[in-house]
Each structure stands twice: as C-alpha cells, then as structure tokens.
UniProtKB/Swiss-Prot annotation:
Positions annotated with a glycan in the UniProt record: N90, N110, N172, N193, N243, N315, N717, N757, N951
GO molecular function: calcium ion binding; peptidase inhibitor activity
Alphabetized Pfam families for the sequence: EGF_CA (PF07645), fn3 (PF00041), WAP (PF00095), Zona_pellucida (PF00100), ZP-N (PF23344)
Biased composition, class Basic and acidic residues, residue ranges: 638-647
Limits of the EMI domain: 34-107
Polar residues biased stretches: 664-678, 950-961
Cystine pairs: C38-C95, C62-C71, C94-C105, C269-C283, C277-C292, C504-C518, C512-C527, C529-C544, C905-C917, C912-C926, C928-C944, C1160-C1218
Compartment(s) where it occurs, according to its Swiss-Prot or TrEMBL record: Cell membrane
Originating gene: Umodl1
Signal peptide extent: 1-22
Protein's name according to its UniProt entry: Uromodulin-like 1
Species, as recorded: Mus musculus
Spans traversing the lipid bilayer: 1274-1294
Keywords, alphabetical: Calcium, Cell membrane, Disulfide bond, EGF-like domain, Glycoprotein, Membrane, Repeat, Signal, Transmembrane, Transmembrane helix
Main location: membrane
Length: 1319
C-alpha cells in the first residue's frame, strides 16, 4: 500500500514538472545543447477554471404545526466555468536569423549565400562550354564557384578578393557524423540541410572569432553508417591547429551525432584563391599561414645566413622573463618569436629588435621559446628552454578508507571530481595561517600528480609563487597533524609526509644546460657548469661553453669537447614547421622527445657488474585545483624503467697492430662517476643526445698548419656488435682524429687515432650510435663530421596485463626487493613457457627482453623484444605471444596481451639520413632522397650516388636472407619528394578496421598499407580463399563475410553472441614468399541482453582493432506500435479502450536468432529508469490486471503482444520500454520459454536504450478513469453468485422439511429386514 501511494505521489509531481526540460529538450523539440538558442517572452491564452456562485429560489417545508406548508428559500450554487486567461512565460527557441532543423538551430534556406558559398568571386571571363551546370557553389568540385552566364549557371574557378586575403589562417576541417551517406542522400537530396547544419554548428562553436567557413564535399565513411564531410575554414588572425581543435571539441560534446572533428593546416600556396603572392614572388607555406618571398631573394644563394647566437633568458621571475639574442649580420631581419607551453603556443610576435619580454606566465612552469628569421631562402631558428621561478614541494597522503578504482582514475568522472574537491578542501583547511593566506591570494597552486594503490596514495605538488617569507618543509609540516584528524578521510599518519620536490630528478623539471650539473635545493634548484666557462653568470648553469674533463678510472680517460650551445639551433628549408611537445609521459617508448635533455644518471650495478640502463620520463600535467586539464592516467607521475634480460658491460679501447682501434667488452671497466651525456641538436631525429650537427666555427689559419676537412665517411661491416668507419684525409700534417661515440644507454666515449679508419666492436645490438669525427693539428680543430650508425637487430614491442598479482608502488624503485623479485619471476616464467628452440636462442644470447615500464592495472608490463638478424621474427613473435598468453604461473588478460612491430622510423632509431626510413615488421629499410650524393656519409651497399635504377631491398626475416637485419641494400632514389612529404608508415592495427553488423562482418583495409607491405589485393581473403575482396575504391579494399559463410563460426551463450573468422593472405603459386604473410583472427562480440524503448536506435557496433582484430557490435532493435494492422507514429493519441499491438525485434531478420522479451514497462517520461513505472510484462509473462496478452515470444526475431495501456494507467502521456534477450536456436537449446522457468535479467548485463513516444490519451477521456472489471471477472462473479443462491435455497428447503416432518414411509421390495426413510 505504501509503495502504491509513493508511486502516485511521484506521478503527480512528474505531471507538474515540464517534462521537456527534464529530458534536455525544449517544448518545440530543440536540444538544450544546441547553439543559437534565445529566450523570448510569450503571452498566450490559457483556459483556467473559475468558481462562479449563482442563486435561485427553492420552496422547502416551513415546519411547524402545518407540516405540509412550503416557504421560499434562496439557494446558492457554485459552478466552474472555463475562461481564457492571458499568461506570460519565457519560451526557448532559435535566435533571430535561425530556424529549427530537427534538434538544432540552423540558418534558413534563403541564406544559402552564407552556408553554400566558396571563397572568391566570379570571374569576368565567360565559362568554358563544357563547364558543369550548377545551382549553388556546393554543387561544384574543389574551390570552384557557381556563376551565372547567359547560357545558365556553370562551375568556374573564382578570382580572389580582398575578403579572402584578409584571412590569415586557413585550415581543413574533417567532420565524421553518425549517418549513412546513402541514407543522407536519400533523405536530403543535394545535402542542403546537411550543409547548413554543419555551417551553423561550426560557426557557432567558433564564436566570437568570426571565421569564414566554406563547405567542400561529403562522402561515406569507413563503414556504411558514417559520413565524412570536409570544410574549409579561415580566420582573420593567426590560430594554431591545437587551439582550433580545442574549440571544436565543444561541438563534439554538444552534438551527439558528431563522432570526431579533425583540423589540418591548408597549403595556401596550392590555391590562388587563398593567397595573395604576386607573380614575381614565391609562396612558402607555414602552419596556418603562408609567406611571400621574392624570387630575387630566393636566387641569392651567396647571401650570408648567420646562426642566432647568445640566445639567453634574463630577468626571470615567477610570471615573466626577457629573452635576448644576437646575429652577426649587417642586414635588418624580422624575427618571429614563439613561446610554447608543451604543445600549446602561448605567444607569437614579430620584432626587428634582439630582445623580447614575455609576461603573464605561470610560476614553476617550463616554457620553450623559439626565435627564427628568414634568410638565404631558409628558416634559421634557435630554441631556448626557460623555467619560471617558484618554490615546489611534494605532499604524499595515504588515505586508508578509499581504494584506487577505475572511476577515480578517470579524470572526467564525477567520482574523481568529487574526490579531488574534497581532498583540496581538506588540504586547504590544514594549511598554517601564512600558507593559507598565500592560497587565498592565488599564489599557491595545488596539483594532483599521481594516484596509486595501497589503499589510495595521493601525491600532491604545491607550487608557491613569490612568498613574502622563507618557506621550507618545516613551514608545511604543521599541516600534517591537522590533516590526520580529517572528518572526511581516514589518513595514515605514518605514510603522510611533506618533502622537497626534486627538480633535478628529470630534465623536464629544470632548465639547466646539458653540460651543467643540476643541484637540488629545498624548494628549488640551481645549476653549475661543468665546463671551463659560464657564458651567462646571471643565470648560472644555463649557458656552458668550453672543454669539460671528466674524472676517470684506471682503464679509460674520457674527455669530451662540449660544443652544445645554450639553445639548440638549426637551419631548415621553407615548409610546414612541425613543433612537437617537449616531453610527454605518454610517449610509447623511453626515447626522448623534442628538446629533451638527459641528466647524468650513473648506471646501477647489479649481479656483479651487469649494467641496468635507467632513464626517467617526465610527468604529465596532473589535476590542478580549480582547473579542468585533460585526463590523468594512473600513475600520473610515472618513472619509466628499462631493464635488460641479457646485459653487457661497457666496452673499452685497445690499439691493434693494424692501426685499428677496437672496442672490447671488459667486466672490470668502470663508468666515470660524473659522466655527462650530450644533447642532440634536434632530439626528434635521434633516440639519444649528442653533439650539435652545426659545424664549429674555425678561425682562419695559414695554410701551413690548418686541419683539412673530413671527407665522406664510409660505414661498412655493420653487425649486431660492431661496425667499421673509413674516411679520406690529408695526412701530410699527420693529423690526429678525435672520435666521440654517444650511446643512448651510456656515457659519451672518446678516442684519438692517427689512422683514417677504425673498427668499433663490443657494442650493443639494435642500438643507434652517434659518431663525431674531427681532425686536430697544431692544436686546432677542423670541421666536425657527424653520422649515425645502428647495429643490426630485429625489434618488436610487447605488452602484457597480469591479473594474478597486485601492483605495488615499490615497483617504481628498481632497487627494491619487490621489483627485483617480480622481474625475476617474469623473466623465469616467460623463459620456461617458450618452446625449446626459442629457449635455446635466449640462453645463447640471441634473444633479449628489455622491460620498459611497469604500471598499474593490475600489473601492465611493457617490454621490447630484440633478436638477431638470422631469426624468423614472426616465429619469435608468435612463440612469445603464445608463451605469455598460456603461462601457468601468471594469469594474464589475453585481450591486453599482444606483440607488435616496433616502428624504428617513427621512434627515430634509424640511420637512414639523409635518406628516407620505411618501416618493416621487425626492422626497417632505407631509400635515398634527392640530394643524397652531397651527404657526408656513405653506407656500404646503399650509396646514394650509385645506379639510380637500383631497387630497395627488404630487411631480413624468414623471407630475406642476403643482408643482415638493420643493414640496407641498394636504395631507390626518390627525386620527387622529401622525407617531410612522405606519409607515415601504417601497421596492421592502423590500416584495418572491423565493422560488426548483424548477419555481416566487414573488413576495411587501406590500400596504402598493402602497397607499403607489397601485399597484392588478390591475395586477401576471409576464412576461405573464395571469400576474397568484395569491392574496392581508390583508397580502400573491402572484404565481407556473412554469418555462416567463409568459415565464419557463430557461438552464443546466455550473455554474448560471438562471430569469428580469420583474415589471411595466400602465397604465390610458385611457393616463393614475395610479401609478408599474416593470419589475423577476427572476433565480433554482441551483447544478448538489450533494453529497447520506443524511439531510440543505438549505434551500430565497431571498431576496436588490436593485434588480432577484435571488434564489438550491438544488436540494433526496433519497436513498432499498431492499432489493428496499421502502424501508428509517435505522439499518437489513443483511448483507454484501444488495444495496441506492439512488435519488438531486431533490425534485420535472422532465422537462427530469436528475440525473447523478459520485461516491459511504461513510464510517464522518456527515462527508462524513471522511479514511477507501470510494469505489464515480467519474467516474459503478462502482469495480471494490465490487459496484456502475449502473441509470440521466442519464436522468431520479432516478439509481439497486445495491451490496453490506458486501461490501467491514469497518466495522459506514457513511454514504453522493454528488455529483450537474443537467443540462438539449436537442437539442444530452445528459445521458447514458459512463464515459470525463465530467469530474470541480471542487473550487470549491458543494456541499450531508445525512446519511443509519447502516447497520448484521446482528448475528452477522463483524466482519472476508475479501474473496471474485465469480462472474465464479471462472468466468474455471476457464477459464484448463482452458486451461493442455489446453495442457500437448498439449505432452506432441507430445514423446512425437517421442521414440518414431511417424510415418505414405504416398504422396500428387496429382502431386507429394516425400513428405509427417503425424502
């Protein structure tokens, strides 16, 4: 009784609330997330009931002695009359100039000059006769316009106008929406509504920038259920790609149908409509813009192109700094200064001076400043790293009543935001008064750096800006007792502490010069040059110059000539400038990113002298109090550790009788304690630091004693542990050649030799080395020559998720006992699970496993797998994957355990320069670019000045045996493009997408991937060779397999239906392998349990592609209502006596799939989880007294039932919802169920929702109809009444006879000796 009362009360409340507002829509059906919504006051006439009293005279008995006498009496009666009353209210509708289109506000169709226009104006010359006809600009291809001519409207190339030239930045915008292109064309011929909807959304999202948006074209997406549209977008001021993308992300969040938006720079130089360079000028494309350079300036090749020097930072404070530079030139250049914070550009300015002030910055943040100018047809630039002043401390808090969960690791979840808000509030309240004052003044910033398990360990970073007093750990320690008695959290006093933040722990935390020592201080740090001179004493350790001598051991003295300037400099040709983030903790490998410097970290010694390489990666920005900065992964403050399963001791030098200098391995070699690694000029091009590539300036000397230049260096005999170098040189002056070898895993090493050839051995395999050679004579140095050489190895990357063990924060410490025990267990388990052949290769040192990272969740291990060139990389990959997935000692998640190719080209671990790197499975190949003969390096076997018809050879695997892996054969010269123009190399993961549909599995493969891997289209098939490519276009090939065809296996249980097939490519008829072979299982999983509501269709499933090409899909349901056999639309009105037939099922019929209804209910709103519900089907059977009858359930892909919905629901509006389960019919499993044995749906199973409705009660029907009895109940009651009457009558007759004693006495004829009394 109480439950029914509560439901009625909630229903009454729901009726009084505006249901449109509760559901996120206006009363006109507009989404409240739409743009261009305005509120208008509206006065409407509303009918209201008013009480009116009327009087009349009635005659009543007067009373008294004459009772029949009547007297007149005035009687008042209250009547309720409906009257029209004006009522004012605010209505939300589209703003002026916009009209409603579906759920959103768009420009009206008569404003086609805005949303369907192209840049430029129509030319004066008449169009060609064969020009296509058109009606709007969008009917034309490319950037053509639709212009009127005497013969009609035709598409022509436009003439630029001042409007387009005023636009500074032009970008291409790619929008992916959830609608099939064929369906879109059918519903919107000409795509007029689609065009104005895109235009309106994009322009509204970018307000108030006033962009120029031009629609280009649309086509179908990678599957049949998406559409890709391209827009051209211009801005009146310079905008970066990152900033535009962030603004358009709001459109993705607001508009459900938009899947993604991608912004790319436009090369204005290719389109005369977008640039204003004259005929005598040459257009040079820049990011977001372009430059016009005079031909005279381009042809002036002898013009001086001096480097930017003395680039330093001055007057650094917590919120500002000055930068200064010099240029040895008589010309007055215009310098472009850009200030970056990570990838985001904060400042962009031009100046003709040599100084620039930068203000309004954050305290304690590392900024990157880039200054550049245009000279001699090149872009000369210099980069400087500056960190603003601040005092930084670390607070570690262990909260015992909270656990680390997936929700709290998701920075976009409500649980994370609630937790961070409570934590910041508790920490703020625990501050001492002086610190609390700084916080209120905005001079203290709190940031969540990491969240770790056990129970929940939070690391906070406190950044203090310009405190008025001395702040140290002792100043913050008083907060701990207050925090430990928090009423919100149970804080562990033993594991909660304050400590200094060590900025010297990683180069991303300080701006010290690579040749300087970072010295950590309490709250801050300082830098000290290790060289002869500090060029900027005002900021010590930022600009170091001169020689640096490192203390040595007994075996080797390493002397390094430090020539790295304070700022990395470079000269690049004109073209798009790509600026990447300075450092990122999400980098997939432990290689340094752009502008990353390596701090001196002495190698850890383990197991009697084996070297464990160690490097740290930066911490990404965590959650900052008061801001919303992206997501935060766990752990937020990661330290990447790289450990080798098989390690080597560092090499040392010995001289041989042949004059060669050979490096050998020695267990007694010791690393110099203060060894310093050098910074490379452009860390993007290398996986390790090194000396700069710019030649050292040499003071002119007399020809009698001037070292000659190093000629072209020839690299030969490259193996996994050695290589040889040889170079021509003028030996008349007996020069000494100074060689420096830099490895990413060890200190820089130097040597001197009188010979012009050297063999380096005892090296690590699969490692990219940087070699610098300089000739010395008379105490003078000649020009330096640099080259990179990679030792031979095949390399893969792997990932495994282990669930049988819990992650521990001690895994971050490589010297901890827990870390060592886990690593030993992991190595031992992997080795023991390998086949005997691979186990022998590993024991012989031909296979090595390097652990790169160990992270939480439960335990995720990232590792690299290196192997010698003669091993079959695919066999090794399959063997390791099988060992990891089937190990008996560790329980792993098979879907999160995989082996994949390590892309040496993307990771810049190749030695192809100046050629182009092309990635292959396990290794890479090199090809020569134009200009290769001018290179100072020649690799034996791939000379760029050789036969131009030479063919590029593949790297070795089981298919290629002539050349060791990592060495390159004769390359293909590429004369038409440069390395910057080449597309990124695809792998199988990126090139293949899986679309899981009902009855069909569709595989889409990019043709570029097939061309890169030299795989013929004709060799591809699904399951069986007959199921080959179904269709293809210019960019993709498609393979389609129906369920039950092409070897497809269909399996189903109570929760999931899984469709499995295999993507293969066959061999050539000759049996010779001409291309890589792959065998990729494909799995499509569908959830059987679905929540279907009248009106919402869930998205089709798709596209998570991992190594073995998994995909997910959804059964798409539909609900249709009928009266009789006629379907009824939404917002239909029915009466209480109308019997509605409802059909629920799958979008497509499949004979083997049956639909079983488990539960159906109605709600007064579109929310299926509304607390007010009216159930009419439960456990697959009708609920009594709901006038519901099931027609069919579990017999086919459709379920049907009838009901009179308003016979038991008093509300005027209802929405219908049903849960259904997909069942596969087979002889052992029948989908037909009875009403007694069907299970209830588990609450944990996946549901999808759509909304139909509403259904309205017919006008004039009673608002609250009393329940009436059905025909069956009436008949039953009548029969019971008759039975009662008959029984009562019989009893009365019997009693009457007994009282009157009326009996019949007769003698029976049978032979009995007694009498029988009968009535």
């Amino acid at each position: 009784m109480m439950s029914r009362t509560v439901r009625l009360v909630l229903l009454a409340l729901a009726c009084t609330v505006d249901l449109s507002q509760a559901s996120g829509f206006t009363e006109n059906g507009l989404s409240l997330l739409s743009y261009q919504l305005c509120s208008y006051p509206v006065t409407r006439s509303v009918q209201k009931l008013q009480a009116v009293q009327t009087s009349h005279t009635a005659y009543v008995y007067c009373g008294g002695w004459i009772p029949w006498k009547k007297c007149p009496k005035t009687v008042y009666r209250t009547q309720y009359l409906a009257m029209d009353v004006p009522e004012s209210r605010n209505v939300t509708d589209c703003c002026a100039g916009f009209e409603q289109l579906g759920l959103y506000c768009v420009l009206s169709l008569n404003r086609s000059r805005e949303f369907a226009s192209r840049p430029g104006v129509c030319p004066t010359a008449e169009a060609e006769p064969l020009s296509p006809s058109c009606s709007l600009d969008t009917d034309c291809s490319g950037l053509q316009k639709c212009c009127s001519w005497p013969g009609g409207r035709h598409c022509v190339s436009p003439t630029p106008t001042g409007t387009e030239k005023s636009m500074v930045s032009w970008y291409n915008v790619t929008v992916l929406v959830k609608v099939g292109f064929e369906d879109l064309q059918r519903e919107d011929p000409g795509l007029r509504n689609h065009t104005r909807l895109l235009y309106s959304l994009v322009t509204s999202a970018l307000q108030p920038l006033n962009p120029a948006v031009h629609y280009l074209t649309s086509t179908g997406g990678k599957d049949t259920f998406t559409t890709v549209s391209w827009l051209l977008m211009g801005f009146p001021r310079l905008m970066t790609v990152a900033n535009v993308s962030v603004m358009l992300d709001d459109m993705v969040n607001r508009v459900y149908e938009v899947v993604s938006i991608q912004v790319q720079d436009v090369n204005e130089c290719l389109h005369s409509e977008l640039q204003a360079c004259s005929v005598r000028e040459q257009c040079r494309n820049l990011e977001g813009s372009y430059q016009c350079v005079s031909s005279q300036r381009l042809n002036h090749t002898d013009e001086d192109c001096p480097p930017i020097r003395d680039f330093v930072a001055l007057n650094v404070t917590s919120s500002s700094f000055h930068v200064s530079w010099s240029l040895n030139s008589t010309q007055n250049y215009n310098f472009h200064i850009q200030v970056y914070k990570g990838k985001e550009i904060l400042r962009s300015a031009w100046t003709r001076g040599h100084t620039m002030a930068v203000s309004d910055l954050e305290a304690g943040v590392l900024y990157r400043v880039r200054t550049s100018y245009l000279g001699c047809g090149a872009n000369v630039s210099a980069t400087l790293v500056v960190k603003t002043d601040a005092q930084v401390f670390q607070v570690t808090i262990r909260i015992m009543d909270r656990n680390l969960t997936e929700q709290i690791l998701d920075c976009s979840s409500g649980e994370f935001w609630n937790f961070s808000r409570q934590l910041f509030h508790e920490v703020q309240n625990s501050f001492p008064q002086a610190i609390s004052d700084l916080y209120r003044q905005g001079r203290l910033r709190m940031q969540i750096v990491s969240l770790q398990a056990g129970s929940l360990v939070v690391t906070l970073r406190l950044t203090l800006q310009d405190p008025d007093f001395s702040v140290g750990v002792h100043t913050l320690t008083p907060m701990l007792p207050v925090l430990s008695v928090s009423n919100v959290f149970q804080v562990d006093q033993q594991r909660t502490f304050v400590q200094d933040w060590d900025e010297c722990a990683h180069s991303s935390e300080h701006d010290c010069h690579p040749s300087a020592r970072c010295i950590n201080l309490e709250g801050s740090y300082t830098c000290q040059c290790l060289t002869a001179r500090d060029a900027s004493p005002s900021r010590a350790g930022r600009v170091c110059e001169g020689d640096m001598v490192i203390p040595t051991g007994d075996e080797l003295s390493v002397t390094t000539k430090v020539t790295v300037p304070a700022a990395s400099t470079g000269i690049t040709t004109f073209g798009p400038e790509t600026l990447t983030e300075s450092l990122s903790s999400k980098h997939p490998r432990s290689t340094p990113a752009r502008s990353q410097t390596w701090t001196p970290v002495p190698p850890s010694v383990r197991d009697g002298g084996s070297i464990v390489r160690q490097d740290r990666n930066s911490t990404g920005q965590g959650q900052t109090h008061g801001t919303h900065q992206g997501t935060t992964d766990a752990p937020l403050h990661t330290t990447r550790e790289s450990q080798e399963l098989i390690t080597k001791d560092p090499p040392f030098l010995t001289a041989t009788t042949t004059g060669y200098v050979v490096w050998h391995s020695s267990p007694t070699w010791k690393t110099p304690p203060n060894s310093t690694r050098l910074q490379n000029e452009d860390p993007r091009s290398s996986s390790f630091p090194g000396p700069p590539s710019a030649p050292t300036d040499v003071t002119p000397e007399s020809p009698a004693c001037v070292p000659g230049p190093i000629g072209k260096v020839t690299v030969s005999n490259v193996t996994s542990t050695s290589f040889s170098l040889e170079w021509p040189a003028d030996i008349r002056l007996s020069p000494a050649f100074h060689l420096t070898l830099v490895s990413p895993r060890g200190p820089a090493m130097t040597m001197e030799t009188q010979n012009n050839n050297v063999t380096l051995s005892g090296l690590e395999w699969g490692t990219l080395y940087l070699v610098e050679i300089v000739a010395k004579v008379c105490g003078k140095e000649g020009a330096r020559t640099q080259l990179k050489v990679r030792t031979v190895a095949q390399k893969l990357a792997g990932n495994v998720r282990i669930t049988s063990m819990q992650y521990s924060e001690s895994f971050l410490n490589t010297s901890s006992r827990e870390h060592r025990e886990f690593v030993e267990l992991f190595f031992r388990t992997v080795r023991d699970s390998l086949p005997a052949t691979l186990r022998q290769h590993m024991d012989a040192g031909r296979i090595r496993v390097d652990i790169i990272n160990i992270t939480n969740g439960s335990i995720v291990v990232e590792f690299n797998l290196l192997m010698t060139a003669d091993l079959d990389v695919r066999e090794v990959s399959a063997g390791f994957l099988n060992a990891l997935q089937n190990t008996s000692m560790l329980e792993v998640v098979r879907g999160k355990t995989f082996m994949q190719d390590y892309n040496e080209c993307d990771m810049k671990e190749d030695d192809c320069a100046p050629g182009t790197c092309r990635n292959t499975f396990g290794s890479f190949t090199c090809s020569c670019d134009e200009g290769g003969p001018d290179s100072q390096v020649e690799y034996s076997g791939r000379s760029c000045d050789g036969d131009p018809s030479g063919n590029m050879t593949q790297t070795p695997g089981s298919e290629w045996s002539p050349t060791p892996a990592g060495t390159r054969g004769v390359p293909v010269p590429i004369a038409s493009s440069t390395a910057q123009d080449l597309p990124l190399r695809l792998n199988l993961m990126d090139a293949v997408s899986v679309s899981c549909e009902i009855e069909t599995v569709i595989i889409t493969i990019q043709k570029r991937f097939l061309q890169q891997a030299a795989i013929p289209e004709a060799s591809l098939y699904l399951g069986e060779p007959s199921c080959n490519v179904s269709r293809s276009n210019s960019t993709h090939v498609f393979l389609v397999a129906g369920w039950g065809e092409c070897g497809t296996i269909l399996q189903s249980n109570m929760t999931t239906t899984v469709v499995t097939t295999t993507l293969r490519n066959n061999l050539s008829p000759e049996g010779v392998i001409h291309h890589p072979q792959f065998l990729s299982p494909i799995h499509c999983a569908f959830q059987n349990d679905v929540l279907t509501s009248s009106g919402y269709t869930p998205q089709w499933g798709v596209y998570t592609v991992i190594e073995d090409l998994h995909g997910t899909g959804n059964f798409v349901t539909e609900m249709q209502l009928y009266i009789g056999d006629s379907p009824i639309p939404q917002n239909y009105s029915v009466s209480a006596s109308d019997e509605i037939k409802i059909e629920v099922g799958l979008h497509r019929q499949k004979s083997s799939l049956k639909v079983v209804l488990t539960e159906c209910w109605a709600t007064p709103s579109s929310n299926a989880k509304d607390p007010v519900t009216f159930s009419f089907i439960n456990n697959s059977c009708p609920v009594p007294n709901t006038y519901t009858s099931v027609i069919q359930n579990g017999h086919s892909s459709k379920a049907q039932f009838k009901l009179r919905i308003f016979s038991f629901i008093n509300n005027s509006i209802v929405y219908l919802h049903c849960k259904l389960r997909v069942c596969m019919e087979n002889p052992r499993n029948s989908c037909r169920i009875s009403c007694n044995d069907f299970r209830s749906l588990r609450s944990s199973e996946a549901l999808h929702q759509m909304t139909w409705g509403p259904l309205h009660r017919t006008e004039g029907a009673q608002a609250c109809t009393k329940p009436v009895l059905g025909t069956g109940y009436i008949i039953l009651l009548a029969a019971a009444a008759l039975l009662v009457v008959a029984g009562a009558t019989t009893l009365l007759i019997l009693r009457y006879q007994r009282v009157r004693q009326k009996y019949n006495l007769r003698i029976q004829t049978d032979d009995f000796s007694y009498q029988v009394f009968s009535q």
